[in-house]
A protein has these predicted regions:
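P-loop NTP-binding core
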Residues: 1-252
C-alpha cells in the first residue's frame, strides 16, 4: 500500500508523521519504505542522515531507470529512499516533458519497480501544487492530510481541486496534528472535522509534545527518543488504526 502524506500548506506535521508513522508500523513488524519526495529533505535529516552523504536518492531513480535499488536500512523493518536538493530542478524537468501522462506517473512507476515486498510505502510529499505534489497524488492508494488548525483547510481545498481535476480516486483521510486542547484554533479544527467529515477523519489525534519536536531535531523517531511520551502513544495508535482499516478493506 502506498500512502502519500501531503498538504498544500507547510508546517502541519507532514514530515513528522511520515517519520513516526513509519517507525510505528515497523514496530508492528510491518516492512516499511519511507520516500523523501520533498526538496527540503527534512525526512532524510530526521532519520539521522546527511543528504550530502547519500549517493543514491529519489532523484537518482528519477533519472536512471536501471538504478539498483539501494535504500538506506534504518532498522530491520524500516527503509528510506533519501531526498535530494535536485528535486526542485527535477520538478521543472517534469513540467517540460512532452508527455504529461508520463510526467505525473514517474514516482508511481519507480515505486512499482522497487516496492515489491513492502507492506507500506510512505511518501513525504512536497507542499505546493506543482509536479512533485501531482506525482505523490498519482502514486498513492491513500493520502493522509495532516492539519494542525483551521487555517490548514485552505490547503485541503486546493488538494481536493487537484484530485478532481486529474480524476484521481485515492482514499483521503484527515489527521489532526500538533493538537493543543488549550488553544481555540485547535479545538475548532477538531470539532469541525468531527461534525462535517467524521468518516474521513482519523480517530487518533496527534498531541503537540516537546518529545516529538526534539526527536526530529536529534535525528531520531519518537520511539527512540521518548518511547513513553504522548507522541509515541499517539503514533502507535495511528499505526494500529491504519493497519486495522487495511485489514477491514482486504476482507471486503
Amino acid at each position: 500500500m502506498i500512502i502519500s502524506i501531503i498538504n498544500h500548506k507547510g508546517g502541519v506535521g507532514k514530515t513528522m508523521t511520515a517519520h513516526n508513522l513509519g517507525a510505528a508500523l515497523a514496530l508492528m513488524k510491518k516492512k516499511v519504505l519511507l520516500v523523501d519526495f520533498d526538496p527540503q529533505c527534512n525526512l532524510t535529516t530526521r532519520c539521522g542522515l546527511n543528504v550530502a552523504d547519500c549517493d543514491v536518492t529519489i532523484s537518482t531513480y528519477l533519472h536512471e531507470d536501471e538504478q539498483e535499488f539501494l535504500p538506506k536500512n534504518l532498522n530491520k523493518y524500516l527503509y528510506l529512499i533519501p531526498g535530494a536538493d535536485a528535486l526542485d530542478a527535477d520538478s521543472m524537468e517534469m513540467a517540460a516533458m512532452d508527455d504529461p501522462n508520463e510526467a505525473v506517473n514517474l514516482l508511481k512507476n519507480i515505486l512499482k519497480r522497487v516496492g515489491e515486498g513492502f507492506d507500506y510505502i510512505l511518501v513525504d510529499g512536497a507542499p505546493g501544487s506543482g509536479m512533485l505534489m501531482l506525482n505523490a497524488l498519482y502514486a498513492a492508494d491513500e493520502i493522509i492530510i495532516p492539519m494542525s488548525d483551521k487555517d490548514a483547510m485552505l490547503g485541503v481545498s486546493k488538494i481536493g481541486k487537484l484530485i478532481q481535476a486529474n480524476r484521481l480516486h485515492p482514499k483521503a483521510h484527515y489527521l489532526i496534528t500538533q493538537h493543543d486542547s488549550r488553544l481555540s484554533l485547535c479545538n475548532e479544527l477538531r470539532d469541525y472535522l468531527i461534525a462535517e467529515c467524521p468518516e474521513l477523519t482519523y480517530h487518533t489525534v496527534i498531541r503537540k509534545t516537546e518529545g516529538l519536536r526534539q526527536a526530529g531535531c536529534n535525528g531520531q523517531d519518537v520511539f527512540q527518543y521518548a518511547p513513553k511520551s504522548n507522541g509515541a502513544a499517539d503514533y502507535k495508535s495511528l499505526a494500529k488504526e491504519i493497519a486495522g482499516k487495511r485489514s477491514e478493506h482486504m476482507k471486503i
